[in-house]
Curated annotation (Swiss-Prot):
Catalytic residues, chain numbering: 167
Family from the record: Belongs to the protein kinase superfamily. KdkA/RfaP family.
Encoding gene (name): kdkA
Organism encoding this protein: Vibrio vulnificus (strain YJ016)
Disulfide bonds: none
Identification of the protein by name: 3-deoxy-D-manno-octulosonic acid kinase
InterPro entries for this protein: KDO_kinase, Kinase-like_dom_sf
Amino acid sequence: MIEQQQFGQSRICYDSEWVSSPELALFDPQYWQAQNKVVGSATGRGTTWFVQLPKITAALRHYRRGGLFGKLVKDHYWFRSWSATRSFAEFHLLKQLREAGVNVPRPIAAYAMRKGLFYQADLLSERIANAQDLVTILQKHSLNAELYQKIGVEIAKMHRVGVNHTDLNIHNILIDAQETIWIIDFDKCYPQAGDGWKQENLDRLKRSFNKERVKRSIHWHDKDFQALLTGYESQQ
């Protein structure tokens, strides 16, 4: 069950299946370190901490800005409403996608703290076990056509729900040990009507393959993307 709890100028939205006692400390890495519950980390735009909850392993991420503006205002965003905060929006989008059968991480808890006209935010979501992103995999070996078709199918499922993944790239697509395809990182993504943006998602993904082929010499060829499109189009 999805519930919310207010703590002064802070609010938590959480799934009571995974969080029985909502508290602000859940979003503090030092809290997890003190309990020896940090089981790993990943560095990108800031550090994502992997923490062990009683029934699930979670990824704890603090929202940070990128680009030039992010160097000036690192983690503050304009406050409009609680539901419009980046953490709450991503939480509910993940919930919508999971309910529609799309393979995305479970949303566990979202946090936002209002500071005057601005806010800061964090998200706890499921860590996908035994999974690697496409960049990591393709640096080691190529993928067969069947896996590319499965990637296309998963993207099509997301599009059928009407969700625009504005940063669809090969860092945000995972394959786990059972060869299940997962799509992650829905910050700034949103529901959208129409169809034109769907091709833009696919074009962005293809540019990502080409970029990493030059940058990291990944094992990828243009024909692989055609296999992905075959899977995608099978769902239309």
